[in-house]
Amino acid sequence: MLRELARSYLTIVKDLSRVMNRLKALYRSWAIPCAGRDVYYTRHRSQWLEKIPEAGTRRRAEQLYQQLDMLQHLRQPARRELLAESRQHTITAKLRQIPSLGPIRSALAVALIQTPHRFRSKRQLWTYSGLGLETRDSGEYHFVKGQVQRKKPVWIRGLNKDYNHDLKGLFKAAAMRASIQPGPFQEFYQRSLAKGIKPTMVRLTLARKIAAITLTVWKKGENFDVEKLKSQAA
């Protein structure tokens, strides 16, 4: 039940995002600046629509607004049902203790992962979530002038390409929130930036940490402990 409710909620959220992007793209196609969220608000729509000079395009914008209203109306009950069903799974209460995970992400994590025992290690979860590093290596040793020598370190090609997109989005969003929300994760984020590490790499490390701690808390059924930040190195 939880898995299907999660799918329904995620589908609505994705459709809502697409409609919002299409709406802004329509305004931009007429060179109408539309930064921020003001363009979506009901109270300002008539003003925005008046900026479109062509009747056909203006009508298309009205239809996009209708889609936006419908999807926003559907999202709230879908969210409520997802949260209500997630309370039937006791682990969600423990996962909510993890900073930046929250009720919705905890519910989605349980729905998407199903059981933590499908992953023997955090690295398997990283790979499944699109947070694993792919390397390139043709062999550990090679011949140089007839002598066997150890090769140089393998090349890192980037993150793995075959993964669960919803789960990756969940952990990346949690990492983004953790980087701006006061707490232990933000402290780690600021310390890493002070060392000269790029923000994108620090957020990736945060996403991996959050995924690893999620797996540990779920497998052991224990409460979140801030000390896990020290032991769950990414």
Spell out what each predicted region is.
Residues 1-94, 166:
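Glycine-rich, often acidic, oxyanion-interacting loops/wings at catalytic, nucleic-acid
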Residues 6-9, 13-16, 20-27, 110, ...:
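Short, amphipathic alpha-helical segments that act as regulatory/interfacial helices
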Residues 23-28, 36-40, 82, 138-141, ...:
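Short coil/turn segments at secondary-structure boundaries
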Residues 36-51, 117, 129, 141, ...:
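HhH-family (HhH-GPD) DNA N-glycosylase catalytic core used in base-excision repair
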Residues 41-44, 97, 101, 163, ...:
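Short, conserved alpha-helical segments within structured domains
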Residues 136, 140, 144, 188-234:
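Low-complexity, acidic/Ser/Thr- and charged residue-rich accessory regions of DNA metabolism proteins
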